[in-house]
Amino acid sequence: MLKVWIVGSEGQIGEAINEVLDPLEIEVLNTDKNALDITETDEVLHFGEINRPDVIINCTGITDTDECEKNPEHAYRVNALGARNLSIVARKLRGKDRPAFHR
């Protein structure tokens, strides 16, 4: 069975993807900011190694420009380092031939 990891599953895009995948025979792993801190490389690697997803869909991000300007370091950590950490997991677990999606 295909295993899909939706990172940021509680957001608008994550919830929409869950609705699409729900009727399919796919195991969905949902994480949000309360369950997993994507800015922490070791935490992301640990989750990936334990669960070994076939596909990673990154629905995380701080899109509010005012928020990004108020706290640029946090915005950078989530938007850049978080995406980097997920790509490290994808590469480490599956190599270049396995998909990872970033919204």
Regions found by a protein language model. Give the residues of each.
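Adenosine-cofactor binding site in Rossmann-like domains, unifying the SAM/SAH pocket
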Residues: D22-H46
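Residues at the starts of beta-strands that form the adenosine-phosphate
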Residues: K3, E27, K96
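NAD(P)-cofactor binding segment of oxidoreductase domains
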Residues: K70-R98
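SDR active-site strand-loop-helix element
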Residues: V7, T31, C59-T60, D97-R103
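N-terminal Rossmann NAD(P)H-binding glycine-rich loop of SDR-like oxidoreductase domains
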Residues: L2-P23
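NAD(P)H-binding glycine-rich loop region in Rossmannoid oxidoreductase-like domains
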Residues: T41-V78, R103
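Helix C-cap/helix->beta junction micro-motif
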Residues: L24, N51, K92-R94
